[in-house]
Amino acid sequence: MTNIRKTHPLIKIINHSFIDLPAPSNISAWWNFGSLLGICLIIQILTGLFLAMHYTSDTMTAFSSVTHICRDVNYGWLIRYMHANGASMFFICLFLHVGRGLYYGSYTYFETWNIGVILLFAVMATAFMGYVLPWGQMSFWGATVITNLLSAIPYIGTTLVEWIWGGFSVDKATLTRFFAFHFILPFIITALVMVHLLFLHETGSNNPSGLISDSDKIPFHPYYTIKDILGILLLILVLMILVLFSPDLLGDPDNYTPANPLNTPPHIKPEWYFLFAYAILRSIPNKLGGVLALVLSILILMLFPILHMSKQRSMMFRPLSQCMFWILVADLFTLTWIGGQPVEYPFIIIGQLASILYFMIILLILPAISLFENKLLKW
């Protein structure tokens, strides 16, 4: 009798993706983040679904409905904080996943990589709109500031902003549509994830050495299923420690004040995972220039396959490139810190220098070092 796992039209797809998938024998823990992101997405969709059952997307009742969830709904506080901190875990995994791709040259699978960058944009858009929903002070002013950036687009800017707002300011119409988009986007993300995996399984996984591993493959199950389960348990452990011991650690106290259009908070800043991009935005004195830099700071990831000058794929055997990679990581930490600071000396100049360094490392220094390493190896 033939195995149903290998013959059934639906189960067969799952089999080829998660069970009999040939995987390189030497992929490290850095390859765990794909599955962890999948788990994060599932957690976010499930907790979000239960929150949506009790949330009302109306300016008069949104803030109260979130309070009601935390106080009156059974385990509502748990669902709410799992959703809020789940977003932070999502972005930690995302940044590590992208960083792994940069370090080991996974961007040479350019279809997979480009879908990944689109996914990053989609997740960032979803997180931004989700942050607006509790309708606290930072929700309202964050939405006002970020949507207002679109007015920098020449000719159509102002019309575009008013069209997105559904009026002349962030109001009831804006909140309702943000809730609608925040609800639908995770399902679009799920579809994109499937495309991401489809492209990945066309080529197979990369590995730390960056060499072709066709001659040494092992089945995904049981080797990598058990490894993924360990990663998932650690992810849930960290998430639950965050949720149960310090749920507000990564949030902003201003968001516990209901939105008030007549009172601007002293420091408007987004959630921690957007601070690096926010710092790049603020480091340019011109509005349109800042918006372009903001978009390019993420879009620049799509240039990595073109900017790859080395004859080797991975950075595993390239110490000079490794050094530059870690300087880039340190630079991103610096930008994240600056994004949370007020706009005054010395933070302004530090932010500007860190922004220049960010683009210089990616566009000039890394490709130049790669060419130099080729020369050193007489390639």
UniProtKB/Swiss-Prot annotation:
Heme b b566 binds at residues 97, 196. A ubiquinone binds at residue 201. InterPro entries: Cyt_b/b6_C, Cyt_b/b6_C_sf, Cyt_b/b6_N, Cytb/b6-like_sf, Cytochrome_b, Cytochrome_b_C_euk/bac, Cytochrome_b_N_euk/bac, Di-haem_cyt_TM. Signal peptide: none annotated. Its cofactor is heme b. It is a multi-pass membrane protein. GO terms for biological process: mitochondrial electron transport, ubiquinol to cytochrome c. One of its GO terms (cellular component) is mitochondrial inner membrane. Its main location: mitochondrion. The chain crosses the membrane at residues 33-53, 77-98, 113-133, 178-198, 226-246, 288-308, 320-340, 347-367. Heme b b562 binds at residues 83, 182. Pfam families: Cytochrom_B_C, Cytochrome_B. Keywords: Electron transport, Heme, Iron, Membrane, Metal-binding, Mitochondrion, Mitochondrion inner membrane, Respiratory chain, Transmembrane, Transmembrane helix, Transport, Ubiquinone. Binds 2 heme b groups non-covalently. One of its GO terms (molecular function) is metal ion binding. It is found in: Mitochondrion inner membrane. The cytochrome bc1 complex contains 11 subunits: 3 respiratory subunits (MT-CYB, CYC1 and UQCRFS1), 2 core proteins (UQCRC1 and UQCRC2) and 6 low-molecular weight proteins (UQCRH/QCR6, UQCRB/QCR7, UQCRQ/QCR8, UQCR10/QCR9, UQCR11/QCR10 and a cleavage product of UQCRFS1). This cytochrome bc1 complex then forms a dimer. Belongs to the cytochrome b family. Heme 1 (or BL or b562) is low-potential and absorbs at about 562 nm, and heme 2 (or BH or b566) is high-potential and absorbs at about 566 nm. Component of the ubiquinol-cytochrome c reductase complex (complex III or cytochrome b-c1 complex) that is part of the mitochondrial respiratory chain. The b-c1 complex mediates electron transfer from ubiquinol to cytochrome c. Contributes to the generation of a proton gradient across the mitochondrial membrane that is then used for ATP synthesis. This is Cytochrome b. It comes from Tamias canipes. The lineage of its organism: Eukaryota, Metazoa, Chordata, Craniata, Vertebrata.
